[in-house]
Amino acid sequence: MKKRTYQKAWLFVLPVVLLVAFNAVIPLMTVVNYSVQETFGDNVFFWEGVKWYEEVLNSERFHASLLRQLAFTGIILLIEVPLGVAIALAMPRRGPWVSVCLVLMALPLLIPWNVVGAMWNIFALPEIGLLGKAINGMGIDYNFTRQPVAAWFTTVLMDVWHWTSLVVLLAYAGLCSIPDAYYQAAKIDSAKPWAIFRYIQLPKMKRVLTIAILLRFMDSFMIYTEPFVLTGGGPGNSTTFLSIDLVKIALGQFDLGPAAAMSLIYFLIVLLLCWVFYTLMMRNEEQ
């Protein structure tokens, strides 16, 4: 008997689609409106065209924030992805310890971002923090509130602690989806662990690793709460990433025109980089 397909199933999700579109389109149009105007009190607006876009794109402040953002994203991806895969490979696939390991890996992801920043702010203080006292006890002058290198080290370490678990869980799900027949065939061929990883595990994990890298890229490129609570963008502007700089311009200086233009440029950069990255990953997978 031929199954009948219900062609109007989309009607059930239409309200949600309209709600999401409504919540996204109106704020976006508001930002576009501010990005081409100069605003004054009493709802007085003057048309400025692309003036704010030119100002942002030619701003050394924007260039410096963008470079810091790209450097931070590159560093944490180079650390978190290999580390997450290594931890996933070390985790048991069967037995009572599976649940224990999964719960431990999920715990950092359940902590709110502002709490993570506050925790690491206390943890890294040179006078009372466990991390700060331990590093200073080794004879290394460490103070993330005054030293840009120490602030970067602490910010990267905090992000690695908070988000490597996401890569671990996704990589572990990919490993668990590999049929046992592959491992049995490798055992018959006396394959070494490196060969098993290279020819069996890594190819089977490509799709989940693509998702993990894409998620971590987008999240790290838009990071705000943790570094802002930890360092406030300092010392100086050493940890002022694009998101922090955008908030300072919009809410600190109340320059709505440049802030709106910068937010749209920011959005387009994230969208473009994600599209390029995803296209390259999918092309490599097809090949």
Model-predicted regions and their roles:
Residues 4-287:
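A structural signal for multi-pass alpha-helical bundles of membrane permease subunits
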